[in-house]
A protein has these predicted regions:
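A short beta-loop-alpha structural element at the N-terminal edge
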Residues: 1-15
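Conserved GNAT-fold acetyl-CoA-binding loop/helix
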Residues: 18-40, 48
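Conserved beta-strand in the GNAT
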Residues: 50-52, 59-69, 78, 83
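A conserved beta-turn-beta hairpin within the catalytic core of GNAT-like acetyltransferases
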Residues: 69-79, 89, 133
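Conserved acetyl-CoA pyrophosphate-binding loop and the N-cap/start of the following alpha-helix
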Residues: 87-100
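Short hydrophobic clusters on alpha-helical segments that form packing/core surfaces
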Residues: 101-105, 121
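Conserved acetyl-CoA-binding loop of GNAT-fold acetyltransferases
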Residues: 102, 126-135
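Conserved GNAT acetyl-CoA-binding A-motif
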Residues: 105-116
Length: 142
């Protein structure tokens, strides 16, 4: 079952986030406090929208979270985080999450996100219609 993400469901998403992104292929080093801060900040962003997938016992299988931004006369959606339980990946849960989020957002045509190049995640996003932005690049400052 896919539902709208609420503040009540954020703690379960935090646990899933830590579990998923600390495991291969990401191998990051998240703790609960930092992940809660990150997801809480995203959730508190004006015009934030998210969905989560639950199994029949109410356990979170995945979630997607981002926010709308105005660009000219259109709204664009920045998908800030998406996470699917490792054991459930490759079974359509990510696609269903993004379809539900698209239905929730209505007529928003432009979405964007950041992910690792040449990764399973980037391959997933390309399979469902995302493409690398030809003119855009990511710049970082040390």
């Amino acid at each position: 079952m896919i539902t709208t993400l609420t503040s009540d469901g954020l703690d379960a998403c935090v646990s899933l986030y830590v579990e998923t992104f600390n495991a291969p292929p990401w191998n990051e080093s998240w703790n609960v406090q930092d992940a809660a801060q990150r997801l809480g900040d995203f959730f508190a962003t004006p015009r934030a929208h998210g969905v989560c997938s639950l199994n029949s016992h109410g356990d979170v299988l995945g979630f997607a979270l981002g926010h709308l931004e105005r660009s000219g006369v259109d709204d664009h959606f920045l998908l800030q985080e998406m996470c699917v339980r490792t054991s459930m990946q490759g079974k359509g849960h990510g696609t269903l999450l993004l379809e539900a989020l698209a239905d929730h957002l209505g007529q928003v045509r432009h979405w964007y996100l950041l992910t690792a190049r040449d990764s399973d995640a980037s391959a997933f996003y390309e399979r469902i219609g995302f493409r690398p932005a030809g003119r855009m690049g990511v710049f970082v400052r040390p």
